[in-house]
């Protein structure tokens, strides 16, 4: 996160609670497709509903806020994931990783760093395996995989993150330039002081790039 912020970008981290929801949300699919225990799916659904009740005050407060966004419900992430993979893809973070990436791209966070430890071999497969399809469906996606293992050089890891940040900045500048050239005002029309950008402005009105880090 410090490396991303040092590059002038805003780091967007996925919520920990949604990872718990991920483990509790595929019960119906597993029962219908794999024939798992029917009582297990009911217990998981009940536990997820209980957690959502505890989380409701936080969600209500976020809806009233003008500075924070309400997290996407886990059911919508499941629908997003099924654009690319089936819910049976549960190795590593499986479909949850896909759904979260699609959701963040739609929310205006196309620059994604998939950060994973060496021990999580399933995530190496599920993460990298969907990069090509993500880029095909979302040409604006700027996705990079950063692996942490004993044999990896820290310099290489930092360089991959910095290269992604540089690409994000170049795209942001290009989008600003294209937006400024797209609308040519008439002689009597007032010229806007600043063109619209694809990035969300920070508190000082300066555009920032957002990056997502998946663990």
Map each language-model feature to its residues.
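An N-terminal assembly and electron-transfer interface module characteristic of large anaerobic redox
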Residues: 1-215
């Amino acid at each position: 996160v410090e490396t991303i912020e040092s590059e002038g970008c805003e780091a967007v981290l996925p919520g920990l609670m949604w990872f718990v929801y991920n483990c509790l949300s595929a019960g119906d699919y597993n029962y219908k497709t794999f024939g798992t225990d029917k009582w297990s799916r009911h217990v998981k659904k009940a536990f997820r509903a209980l957690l959502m009740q505890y989380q409701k005050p936080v969600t209500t407060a976020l809806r009233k806020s003008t500075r924070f966004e309400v997290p996407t419900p886990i059911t919508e992430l499941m629908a997003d994931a099924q654009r690319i993979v089936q819910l049976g893809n549960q190795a590593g973070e499986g479909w949850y990783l896909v759904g979260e990436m699609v959701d963040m791209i739609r929310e205006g966070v196309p620059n994604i760093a998939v950060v994973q430890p060496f021990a999580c071999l399933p995530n190496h497969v599920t993460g990298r395996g969907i990069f090509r399809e993500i880029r095909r469906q979302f040409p604006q996606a700027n996705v990079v995989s950063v692996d942490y293992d004993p044999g990896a050089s820290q310099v290489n890891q930092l360089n991959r993150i910095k290269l992604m940040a540089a690409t994000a900045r170049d795209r942001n500048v290009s989008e600003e330039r294209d937006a400024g050239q797209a609308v040519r005002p008439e002689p009597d029309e007032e010229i806007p002081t600043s063109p619209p950008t694809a990035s969300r402005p920070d508190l000082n009105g300066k555009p920032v790039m957002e990056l997502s880090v998946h663990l």
